[in-house]
Structure formats: C-alpha cells, structure tokens
C-alpha cells in the first residue's frame, strides 16, 4: 500500500529539485557565457585551423650585382610537387605511381605505398623541378584523370655566372636560406617576406569547390651591389686558374685585388672553385677522383670533406705563414720607429746564430754588406733577423697588432678566424723574434696580409676590407651606401712613402722582376714560405704581392699558390707573373695611361737566385 508524503516533505523535496535545476541552469549559463565571450577567440582560432588551408607563397631573395652592374645572383621559377592521397582516385593509384616514378626518377613501389595511405592529406614528391618536368606531370594527370597531385610554383636561387665569384657569393639550401658567403652573411636582408593563400576546406581536408581564397602577396628581399668589379674578377680568375694548372697546385690558390685607399675588394678568388647552382658536385677533378675511388662510410666522409673544402673561402678563412712578404711589415715598423733607416747597413755571411740556433738565407748565398733597401731587394733573412733585433720584441708585437694581424679584419663575409696565431711579447724569445721577423712562426689570414700591405703603401692607414658597397631596394633604388672605414693610422706618411720606393726597387732590381709591367711603375715583394705543419717537408706556399702604380698607389694584387709542384716553388717566379698579368689588365681597363719606366726588363731568375729545396726557412 502506497504511502502519501506529508505536504511539508513534498514541498521540501520540490525545493531541492528546483534548487538543483536552477544551479544546473546557472552553471550552463556561465559556461555558455565563457564559451561565447571569454573563449571565443580560442575556438575561432581552432575552427579556422580546421576550415582553412594556408599555402605559403615563397618570396624571392634580393638580387646581387657586381660593381659594374653584372647580375650575380637572382631567382628562377621552379615547381614543387606534392600529393594528397585522400583526393586521388583509388583505381588510378597504380597508374599515378608508375607515371610519376618514370618522370621523376622515383621508385614506383614506394610511391604506391604513399598513395595507398588514405589517411594522408599531404606528401612531398619532389622539390624544385623545372618547367619541363612540371609540364610532364601536369600532362600525365590531365590525360588520365588523376586528381590530388598539386603543382605549386616555387622559387630557387640562380647564379647566372656559374662558378664566377662562387667562394664570395656562397649559396642557399632547399629552403632558400643562406649557407655560406654573402648569402649567409646578409641572409636576413636578402630574405623577403613570404606571401600566403588561404583556401577553405571541409572536415576531411578536401578543397571546397564553392570556396573562397584570400591572398597576401610576397615581398622580395633587399638586394646588394658589390665592390667586386666583374671585369677585374675575370682577370683574376683566368690568370689564377691557368697558374693552378700550369704549376700543378695541390692545395688551391688564393687571389685578392683591393683598392689600397678604401679597402674595397675588387676581386677575390679561391681556385679551384665550384658552381653554386650545384654546390654538392665536386668540381676539383683530383678531389672527385679520390672520392669516387672509395665506398661506404669512407666515401661519405671524403665527399663531405671535399664539399666543405670547396665551399671554404680560403682567402678569408684560412691562416698561413706569409713568408718573405711579411718583411714589408718588419721593415715598415723598423723605419717608423727609427730603429733603422734606408741606408742602415747589415752583413749577411754564411749564417747567423741566435741563442744557439743558426739561420741562413734560403739560397745559401752570402749577400755581404747591404743596406736595408738592398736587404729587401735580396729578401735576406739574416739582415731581417738583425733588423728585428734592433726593433725589439715589444715594438715588433705592437706593430704586428697595429697592422691588424691579431684580430679579424671585420670584412662583411662569414667564417673569418677570430684570431691569428702569433707570439705575444711575454712569450717571444730571441729565436721566435728572429723567425717572425722574416715571416715564419706566425700565421695570419691572406686577407689580413693584403690589408696590412695596403696600409704600408697608402700613407699608413689600415682600411677595413669590405665587399658590399650598396644596399638596394627590390626596385633597384638605393637604400644605403657603405662608406670606407679607416681602422687606425699605423705608419707615418713619410714612412709609407719610403716603403713605396723600396718596394719599387724590389721589382726593378730584386726578386720581383717578374712583376714588371711595361709602362707602369710597380712595387712588390715575393714570399716562399714553408708549411711547417705539413707532413711534406717540401710543401711551400709561393706568394707575391704587387701594387700599381707604386708612385700613386691604387691597386694591390696578392697571389698565393699553395703547394705548387713545378720547376720551382719561388713566389717571385710563379706568383709574380700572375700579379703582373692581373694588374696590367686592370690598369688598362681603368684607363690609367702608360709612361716610360726606368729599370730592367722582366727576366727569369737563374738557379742561383732560387731557394734550395731542403731549406728549413723562408726565402725570396
């Protein structure tokens, strides 16, 4: 028998139910308020993420031009191929896999496996194919009713001059980001702002036929105009390439041409080079042969090393012992301090002993009594040991630093060494001072040496080397001009004038006779430095630095052949003619008239002038 609840109990229960219902309604209202107002942005963002597909439209990188307007780096159209297996007709998966494999050189079975994964809405087929390949894929799809293959227009970096200036320009990766050279140093400036296309899609990721598209157009990056003159660069690359082949240079060669008064780099080459359009292809035949002879892990390691070697800008990144070219620095410092003058006399005998270590000139030739000028002409080690001793280690180290040989030059290129290898005064004894005075026992970069010699001849100013003269807007208009920078005054102007006279004497009467140019006054200095860290005790670097016109200095050319295998390793014989060829073409190109020049005609040195093969230290 059912019991009837008392009225007061019923009302109490009704109130409880009503309260619970009201609480639930209030909670629901609060939650709805939170969802609609407080969390509206979050859910809107999630919804848009599901309803829209954004396709990036890559921006072109900024263009790079030479000083004389030659296009060095630009962009070319290419196409990236992608597939959406969800959208591909199931009955045509095999046909699509076979056709695309044939066009793209891919594995058909692997493609079919990708296409059979119906959960996938996007898979990459091939990056950056050319127009012909993209057209073949498009024709295949249209002829066979294959849907789900997307052909997206893309952009890739293009170097219209091929190997020209490759070590300076560098290259980009598949994402169009700079990897080396100017492409890396100025990556942020050259990189543009990507565009985007937004397309509506359904819940399964299919593009809606009755959808909308919105587009933000890409913006091209800013461009660069270089100090590099394409004509002078051609002169340097051609002459250096011939020298590398003629003298069987094993460890690449370096050439630098600079404006001595501004620090602007007019040409820079590391030879052999590579093609930045195909940076992973080894262009040095000898290195390529060595790699191809290996297999497995050894081959992969050798290939990586060969690639990194050819990408390396030796002129900026490598250190070397400058040899007798460095005598210009020792001589300039000694003259500037008053430790010696042009007519100070020194004696060169069979050898000289310093703290129990005997030194001799590389050709074992006794020069006898000679002035400082004659010692420079003869590149006499013994005399420069005595000059270094008069200068003293404190002053020597002070000028070494003042010439910028202990710090990066600050050039606007990547991978410059943070410091060179040198002795400080507290670590330098008499033997170290002796060997450093004639260019051994210290290591500097090729660019540091070139910049230091510019300071020797330009009135004593150390100028910061640079390769970019202007920043350009995408339309070619000027954004910023880069002005030359003087780091410091190193020498007195009169010391620099004296050094110019002495350097001309080296070319007229000394070891630089092969750098003479008919109708132009030239100054220079040779060097043949031993590679003390090489397993081959006969390994040498043959170098020469030349400046013209020496009476009104404008252009410097430094040429270094690393490990030549020729009839000699003397820089005055192998590298001086290269400097002469490059400078003569440059002077003519720049419209500098010839004039009568006193002095001897270029002559090949005799055997007595050349260093003996077994010498332990540098000679002329």
Question: Language-model segments: which ranges?
Answer:
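Periplasmic/cell-envelope proteins involved in peptidoglycan metabolism and beta-lactam response
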Residues: 1-294, 310, 319, 394-404, ...
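Beta-lactam-recognizing serine transpeptidase/beta-lactamase-like catalytic domain environment
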Residues: 73, 202-214, 260-325, 329-561, ...
């Amino acid at each position: 028998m059912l019991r009837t609840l008392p009225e007061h109990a019923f009302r109490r229960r009704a109130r409880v139910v009503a309260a619970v219902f009201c609480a639930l309604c209030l909670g629901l209202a609060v939650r709805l308020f939170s969802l609609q107002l407080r969390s509206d942005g979050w859910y809107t963002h999630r919804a848009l993420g599901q309803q829209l597909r954004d396709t990036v439209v890559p921006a072109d990188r900024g263009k790079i031009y030479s000083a004389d307007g030659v296009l060095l780096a630009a962009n070319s159209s290419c196409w990236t191929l992608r597939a959406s297996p969800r959208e591909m007709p199931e009955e045509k998966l095999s046909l699509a896999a076979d056709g695309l494999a044939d066009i793209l050189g891919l594995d058909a079975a692997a493609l079919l496996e990708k296409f059979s994964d119906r959960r996938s809405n996007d898979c990459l087929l091939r990056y950056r194919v050319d127009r012909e390949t993209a057209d073949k894929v498009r024709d295949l799809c249209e002829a066979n009713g294959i849907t789900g293959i997307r052909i997206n227009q893309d952009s890739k970096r293009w170097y219209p001059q091929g190997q020209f200036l490759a070590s300076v320009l560098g290259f980009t990766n598949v994402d169009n980001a700079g990897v080396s050279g100017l492409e890396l140093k100025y990556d942020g400036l050259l990189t543009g702002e990507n565009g985007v296309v937004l397309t509506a899609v359904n819940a399964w990721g299919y593009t809606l036929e009755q959808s909308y598209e919105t587009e933000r157009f890409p913006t091209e990056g800013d461009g660069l105009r270089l100090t590099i003159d394409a004509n002078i660069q051609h002169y340097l690359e051609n002459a250096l390439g011939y020298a590398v082949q003629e003298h069987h240079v094993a460890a690449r060669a370096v050439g630098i041409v600079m404006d001595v008064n501004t620090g602007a780099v007019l040409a820079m080459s590391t030879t052999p080079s590579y093609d930045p359009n195909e940076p992973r292809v080894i262009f040095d035949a000898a290195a390529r042969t060595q790699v191809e002879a290996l297999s497995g892990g050894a081959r992969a390691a050798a290939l990586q090393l060969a690639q990194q070697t050819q990408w390396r800008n030796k002129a900026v990144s490598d250190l070397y012992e400058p040899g007798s070219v460095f005598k210009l620095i020792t001589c300039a410092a000694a003259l500037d301090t008053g430790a010696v003058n042009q007519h100070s006399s020194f004696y060169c005998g069979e050898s000289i002993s310093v703290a129990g270590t005997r030194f001799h000139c590389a050709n074992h030739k006794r020069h006898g009594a000679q002035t400082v000028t004659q010692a420079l002409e003869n590149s006499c080690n013994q005399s420069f040991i005595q000059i270094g001793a008069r200068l003293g280690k404190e002053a020597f180290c002070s000028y070494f630093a003042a010439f910028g040989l202990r710090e990066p030059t600050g050039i606007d290129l990547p991978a410059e060494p943070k410091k060179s290898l040198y002795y400080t005064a507290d670590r330098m004894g008499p033997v170290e001072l002796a060997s450093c005075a004639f260019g051994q026992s210290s290591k500097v970069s090729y660019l540091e040496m070139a910049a230091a010699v510019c300071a020797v001849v330009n009135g004593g100013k150390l100028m910061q080397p640079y390769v970019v003269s202007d920043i350009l807007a995408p339309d070619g208009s000027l954004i910023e001009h880069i002005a030359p920078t003087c780091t410091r005054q190193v020498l007195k102007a009169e010391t620099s004038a004296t050094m110019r006279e002495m350097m001309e004497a080296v070319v007229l009467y000394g070891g630089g006779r092969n750098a003479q140019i008919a109708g132009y006054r030239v100054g220079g200095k040779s060097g043949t430095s031993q590679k003390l860290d090489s397993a081959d005790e006969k390994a040498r670097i043959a170098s020469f630095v030349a400046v013209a016109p020496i009476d009104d200095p404008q252009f410097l050319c430094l040429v270094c052949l690393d490990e030549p295998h020729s009839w000699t390793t003397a820089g005055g014989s192998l590298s001086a003619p290269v400097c002469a060829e490059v400078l003569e073409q440059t002077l003519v190109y720049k419209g500098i008239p010839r004039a009568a020049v006193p002095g001897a005609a270029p002559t090949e040195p005799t055997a007595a002038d050349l260093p003996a093969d077994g010498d332990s230290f540098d000679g002329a």
